[in-house]
């Protein structure tokens, strides 16, 4: 039977798909595009991937199936030509603090193996290598000293420890030993002077005295074995006739000698041990380098690399406040007089008053309040009618909170104290997560923690030249390991992630970054004959890096895989072998194949909206004139230097639309989100989060609100929906409660809530579905047979408005809801804003966990639009065009520019040139990602930025503005 050339889909009806019939070529790069909500993901993920995965899992045994997530069978008549499917979605890789870029890509596993096999342990005390040897190797080494050499074979019994050691010396005499070397002097055991137990001593047992000759191998082996047994794996050969040079017997001399030693000596160890400090390393195995294994993890932080510590900046968030006005945050809300009376007593000693600002207090006073006093202080307390004095030391706020946090069993109390804590690098391992023994093992002067800290670009360069610094034997052992590491680093580099470090926590990655990491891992696995389904891999990627990403996708195809990509990026669509355009609109108005074929077929199809944008027939317009920033109305960040920012000072003009641009890893998010947003939220909104390191920020007096509209879910449960989030559900319930039928029955608005008892169906508790666990199959959600999925009981559903119950209203699309509630402004106005941001196709009661990141972001935007504008709000959006088609981008820009027209300020982090070209002002970071970035390369209008030769954004923007003549305008003015 010949291999099928196509993936044949018949009757796909999942979600909004309208019985799609489609034949997709196998082993090709296929792009699915179309408006947001048109059904692309329903076809690619919920139909094609789900069926491919389901069939593969179904072919496994029942025992294996219980460990794998089983997909629901999609609503489709037939699919032929499927391969086992792998999906790579936008989800952040892992929130587990133990998951890093290195562990996800398996590079860290190879690093552990490399360090275990070719790493050399070094002594932290001397900086010299530590080696382990067999008895035979030790004998051979002694014989190399030369014939006639006189040696003492010593067993180092005590190394730098206090004590008298009378019992130990008596025990040695019983065993037949006669001489010892104590603190550098030889004695007969019976003549050893009494040792002062207050001082540290060194004691070596003289096991043998030998003169090196070729025939003493057997005697030497016996002596060395005795030494190793006595001294727990250590033996010393000391030259009797070779004193150390005078300069090495002075303080700070040789690393090979202990206190008062005056003769040259060689230490042998059957373990890895330091001759000076006695620092030993257990057997060097890969698990020693794992921070997820007790064998290697730092015992202080359990391998996390950081510890929660009380943060002084959170205890005193506003140093210019007075003590009476609540400068000390943990005490600010208390109504008890105790805290003020405590401060008054401290003030008497350290010279301050309750009316003093924290910043005016002396360092000594601040230290006493935060960390306590050594000397006793008399405190006077008045508690109602009772008055008393007490003399004691003051514990200090920081030690007090730390003690209570450790001692309390109350989750609430711990949470309350954790508000004043932040993560600080572990003091024991300096954030490297590993035990000292693991960090003592080095390759080419670096330990595994230092290699992990490198950026992928730097690590790639380091591993390229590493073989030159290894011995022939080490290279033989490491050749295959190095090949695997270098390949994986190259793949990460190819998908535009060269600025990340291997130690970067997975939970801090953006959706696009984590997706590209998984993509790099897949290329590393080298699978063929697989169906890959990807969701917008270009998210968060600068145009400059797009070509490398597309090369990667083509490589996946060329090794014999079918690659399906849901994508809106113009370059990705034009590079595809086959394009499927889903539409014509979103939601119930979509779900059909509008056009399919090569990119040129799409462009020549008159029905395809995508084709019109690709051909230039439609375009997002450049505004007729740009708003001019007012000189004195701006927020200025001075001296931002967190992560890779190089002491950046930049101003964001207010009352205009600003785009923060630059290559991935250039420092955009650190500057805008970590520094500016967190500082503004703290100052303007009273938030508690700590901003990243900077000197100061000027201009907050011009804004009264700062809002970060991100793509996080609007709710994680099926009970949360667009109506509850935007506040539309409250007036809907109020309206139904005010209807004659509801009044006659005495129903209150709560009756129409599916979250509380009363009006909801109790069989499913207002969920509309009941979960049934199936052990070898996926959990099945069946429609509740009492309310039939309506969520409410029969009595509640008896109340109708225009013939519709509350359940019918929640099942309407936003578009239908606007028409239905045309005469109810309180509801209509909230729904109109959802319609405005292009969400007319979603259902009013659609479960929040079914919304994409882009949809969730636009629901948040709609909520902001529906509020009364003060004209002084700063809106911050991180890549708002994620998941948006060209046409959706045009609509979104209308909304954002409308917010600016109301006097507000909008700042977006964006790579999409269609958005950047409409900005009034651009701040471009770079020039590269990671260590090569962190500077402001250009700032000004788009026309000014294109003139900056170092700006990659400027180069691509110039191309776009020159290349695309606008024939028809669809966008914001």
Curated annotation (Swiss-Prot):
Q: Which GO terms describe its cellular component?
A: cytoplasm; excinuclease repair complex
MF (Gene Ontology): ATP binding; ATP hydrolysis activity; DNA binding; excinuclease ABC activity; zinc ion binding
Set out the biological process GO terms recorded for this chain's protein. Answer: nucleotide-excision repair; SOS response
Where does the UniProt annotation locate this protein?
A: Cytoplasm
Q: Does the keyword DNA damage apply?
A: yes
Signal peptide feature range: none
The keyword DNA damage is assigned to this record? yes
A Pfam family hit: UvrA_DNA-bind
- Which residues are ATP-binding? 34-41, 662-669
Q: Which CDD domains match?
A: ABC_UvrA_I, ABC_UvrA_II
Q: Where are the zinc fingers (C4-type)?
A: 761-787
Describe the location of the ABC transporter domain by residue ranges: 331-609, 629-958
Could you list this entry's UniProt keywords, alphabetically sorted: ATP-binding, Cytoplasm, DNA damage, DNA excision, DNA repair, DNA-binding, Excision nuclease, Metal-binding, Nucleotide-binding, Repeat, SOS response, Zinc, Zinc-finger
Q: Which family does the record claim for this protein?
A: Belongs to the ABC transporter superfamily. UvrA family.
Q: Mind telling me which HAMAP family this protein's record contains?
A: UvrA
Cross-referenced NCBIfam families = PRK00349.1, uvra
Biological role: The UvrABC repair system catalyzes the recognition and processing of DNA lesions. UvrA is an ATPase and a DNA-binding protein. A damage recognition complex composed of 2 UvrA and 2 UvrB subunits scans DNA for abnormalities. When the presence of a lesion has been verified by UvrB, the UvrA molecules dissociate.
According to the record's subunit comment, the protein's assembly and interactions are: Forms a heterotetramer with UvrB during the search for lesions.
UniProt-recorded name of the protein: UvrABC system protein A
State the species of origin: Rhizobium meliloti (strain 1021)
């Amino acid at each position: 039977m010949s291999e099928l050339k196509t993936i044949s889909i018949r009757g796909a009806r999942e979600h909004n798909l309208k019985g799609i019939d489609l034949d997709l070529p196998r082993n090709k790069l296929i792009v699915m595009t179309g408006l947001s909500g048109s059904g692309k993901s329903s076809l690619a993920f919920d139909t094609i991937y789900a069926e491919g995965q389901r069939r593969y899992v179904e072919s496994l045994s029942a025992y294996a199936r219980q460990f794998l997530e089983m997909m629901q069978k999609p609503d489709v008549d037939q699919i032929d030509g499927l391969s086992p499917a792998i999906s790579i979605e936008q989800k952040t890789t892992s929130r587990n603090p133990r998951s890093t870029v290195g562990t996800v890509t398996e590079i860290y596993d190879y690093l552990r193996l490399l360090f275990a096999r070719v790493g050399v342990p070094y002594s932290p005390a001397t900086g010299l290598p530590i080696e382990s040897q067999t008895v035979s190797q030790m004998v051979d080494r002694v014989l190399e000293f030369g014939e006639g050499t006189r040696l003492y074979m010593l067993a180092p019994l005590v190394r730098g420890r206090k004590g008298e050691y009378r019992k130990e010396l008596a025990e040695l005499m019983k065993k037949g030993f006669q001489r010892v070397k104590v603190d550098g002097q030889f004695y007969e055991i019976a003549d050893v002077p009494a040792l002062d137990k207050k001082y540290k001593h060194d004691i070596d047992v003289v096991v043998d005295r030998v003169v090196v000759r070729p025939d003493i191998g057997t005697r030497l082996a016996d002596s060395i074995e005795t030494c190793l047994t006595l001294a727990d794996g250590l033996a010393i050969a000391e030259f009797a006739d070779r004193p150390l040079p005078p300069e090495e017997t002075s303080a700070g001399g040789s690393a090979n000698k202990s206190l008062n030693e005056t003769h040259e000596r060689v230490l042998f160890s059957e373990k890895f041990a330091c001759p000076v400090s006695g620092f030993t390393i257990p057997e060097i195995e890969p698990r020693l380098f794992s921070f997820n294994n007790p064998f290697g993890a730092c015992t202080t932080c359990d391998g996390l690399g950081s510890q929660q510590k009380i943060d002084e900046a959170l205890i005193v968030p506003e140093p210019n406040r007075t003590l009476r006005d609540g400068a000390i945050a943990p005490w600010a809300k208390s109504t008890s007089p105790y805290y003020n009376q405590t401060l008054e007593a401290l003030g008497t000693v350290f010279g301050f008053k309750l009316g003093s600002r924290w910043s005016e207090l002396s360092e000594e006073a601040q230290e006493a309040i935060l960390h306590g006093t050594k000397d006793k202080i008399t405190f006077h307390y008045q508690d109602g009618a009772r008055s008393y004095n007490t003399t004691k030391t003051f514990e200090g706020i920081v030690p007090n909170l730390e003690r209570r946090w450790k001692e309390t069993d109350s989750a609430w109390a711990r949470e309350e104290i954790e508000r004043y804590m932040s993560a600080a690098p572990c003091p024991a391992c300096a954030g490297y997560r590993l035990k000292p023994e693991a960090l003592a093992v080095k390759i080419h002067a670096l330990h595994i923690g230092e290699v992990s800290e490198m950026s992928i670009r730097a690590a790639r360069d380091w591993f390229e030249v590493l073989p030159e610094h290894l011995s022939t034997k080490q290279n033989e052992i490491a050749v295959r390991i190095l090949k695997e590491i270098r390949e994986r680093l190259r793949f990460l580099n190819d998908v535009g992630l060269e600025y990340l470090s291997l130690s970067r926590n997975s939970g801090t990655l953006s959706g696009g970054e984590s997706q590209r990491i998984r993509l790099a891992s897949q290329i590393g696995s080298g699978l063929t004959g697989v169906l890959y389904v990807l969701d917008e891999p270009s998210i968060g990627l600068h145009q400059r890096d797009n070509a490398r990403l597309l090369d990667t996708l083509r490589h996946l195809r060329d090794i014999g895989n079918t690659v399906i990509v849901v994508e809106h990026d113009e370059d990705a669509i034009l590079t595809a072998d086959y394009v499927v355009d889903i539409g014509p609109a979103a939601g119930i108005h979509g779900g059909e194949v509008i056009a399919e074929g090569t990119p040129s077929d799409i462009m020549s199809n008159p029905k395809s909206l995508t084709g019109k944008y690709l051909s230039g027939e439609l375009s997002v317009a450049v505004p007729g004139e740009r708003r001019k920033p007012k000189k004195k109305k701006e927020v200025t960040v001075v001296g931002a230097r967190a992560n890779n920012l190089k002491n950046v000072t930049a101003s964001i003009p207010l009352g205009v639309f600003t785009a923060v641009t630059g290559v991935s890893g250039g420092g955009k998010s650190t500057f805008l989100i970590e520094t500016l947003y967190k500082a503004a939220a703290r100052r303007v909104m009273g938030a508690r989060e700590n901003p990243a390191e900077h000197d100061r920020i000027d201009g907050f007096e011009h804004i009264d609100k700062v809002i970060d509209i991100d793509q996080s879910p609007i709710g994680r449960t099926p009970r949360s929906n667009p109506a509850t989030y935007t506040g539309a559900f409250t007036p809907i319930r109020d309206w139904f409660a005010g209807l004659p039928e509801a009044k006659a029955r005495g129903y209150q608005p709560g009756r129409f809530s599916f979250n509380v008892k009363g009006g909801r169906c109790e069989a499913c508790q207002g969920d509309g579905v009941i979960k049934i666990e199936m052990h070898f199959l996926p959990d099945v959600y069946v429609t509740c047979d009492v309310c039939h999925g309506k969520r409410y009981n029969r009595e509640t559903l008896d109340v109708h408005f225009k013939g519709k119950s509350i359940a019918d209203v929640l099942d309407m699309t936003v578009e239908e809801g606007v028409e239905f509630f045309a005469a109810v402004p309180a509801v209509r106005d909230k729904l109109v804003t959802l319609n405005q941001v292009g969400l007319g196709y979603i259902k009013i009661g659609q479960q929040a966990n079914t919304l994409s990141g882009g949809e969730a972001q636009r629901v948040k935007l709609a909520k902001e639009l529906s509020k009364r504008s003060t004209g002084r709000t700063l809106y911050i959006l991180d890549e708002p065009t994620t998941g948006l088609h060209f046409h959706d981008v045009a609509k979104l820009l209308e909304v954002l520019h409308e917010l600016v027209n109301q006097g507000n300020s909008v700042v977006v982090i964006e790579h999409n040139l269609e958005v950047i070209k409409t900005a009034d002002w651009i701040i471009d970071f770079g020039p590269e990602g990671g260590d090569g970035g962190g500077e402001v390369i250009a700032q000004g209008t788009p026309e000014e930025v294109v003139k900056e030769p170092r700006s990659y954004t400027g180069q691509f923007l110039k191309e776009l503005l020159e290349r695309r003549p606008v024939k028809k305008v669809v966008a914001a003015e």
